[in-house]
Amino acid sequence: MHGFSNKQHDGFLGHSYICEWVNLGANTNNSNLKNNYGNVRFFLGDINVETNKKFIGVMMGDYSKSGISTMFNTGTYVGVGANIFGGGFQKKMIQSFKWGKDDLTDLDKFIETCKIIKSRRGQALHHSEISLLKYIYKNNK
């Protein structure tokens, strides 16, 4: 788990990779082992990555969030700025800036929220970061 990310409540995040400024809701859980004990695969867009590993949890990009009791399957990938919530297991590949299961985040509201998130920790959202987030949003597939 990288800096300024937040996991304050119950839940399991075994063998996961959590980037910066991620907020994980209470009881967010992931599986980290397939039921058939096979190697874990995960998806990056259209690319299917064979890891040759038995244990991999969720990988979450910067500024992503999960709601209360969110469940991630083994080898789930969550892009930048996604706000994940809703019952049942989530999709294994969640694109950047996803809102819930089917919608996209409003970019202007997202940037304002990022400013609030960082200001709570005495940090500022710099113009270079805003430019990068806009680039990722524009090129999101």
Positions of PLM-derived features:
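Glycine-rich hexapeptide-repeat left-handed beta-helix
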Residues: 1-141
